[in-house]
């Protein structure tokens, strides 16, 4: 009788354990599956950053920004353009490399050239994506132009932006993504041999 009771008790324990395992497994499978699915559905893939490679600089191009070869057909003379105004004129984003000038020297050089004639104003410094730029502005018949100066190796680069405030979103997107090579002299020499028309523009 005692053995029979123990046998029944053992059977009950085994049955209870089996049910518990099935219950836990079902719950974990259901909950885990649901959680995984919801995470998978809720998490969208971040868009891959696409930079257009102009050889001596790379930059992410907003859809509204275009490319101009009006200053020259090769990549070392490339200019970026903002949307045209009602007169068909487009403001520009123009990078310029100064091999022999530091950032401070280039800034001082432009301040001297523009001077009182164009109401030059020193704008201090700003930072975009960890890079520091010295700023200056001047005014002419086309509006207010902003110049931003930064260090490269060798020398410095300044970017001229026409009517910055009118194109702030696009201009800051460009400044936040622009990058320069370690050897500007080598990159610019290579860019002089590449036509702008052969470069893949990525938006």
Predicted regions and their residues:
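Secretory pathway targeting signatures of secreted, lumenal, and periplasmic proteins
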Residues: 54-106, 141
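Bacterial signal peptide processing site
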Residues: 25-28
